[in-house]
Amino acid sequence: MEEKKNIGEVTLGYGDGPLRKIGITDMVRCEFADHRLVTVAYTEEDAYLLSVENPQSSGRATQTNMYLTEGSAAALFYTYILYLEHNGTDANELFKKYILDDKEIKYEFSPKD
């Protein structure tokens, strides 16, 4: 399999542990009307960096990140949808409310080779 070219890198670490630089090979970033910035980046370790950045004025955490394997990312999304369905929330309606009705989403994809 052909090795993908890095388009950037991210520094990962936790607490007092060692920091390490990981190459990003693919990504998509969406900016929503409320200036929330959501990024899904695929890394050279075959894992995903999921990031949500909020404006300071939102009162929410300014940045939240998760670094997950493909299996863990799939399990997270599946469990979220399962939770919604269990509580009587239609996932498609929820996505429509927050995503499809937002006419001002700006998308940025990494370039394809």
What are these model-derived regions, one by one?
Residues M1-D113:
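Positively charged, low-complexity terminal tracts
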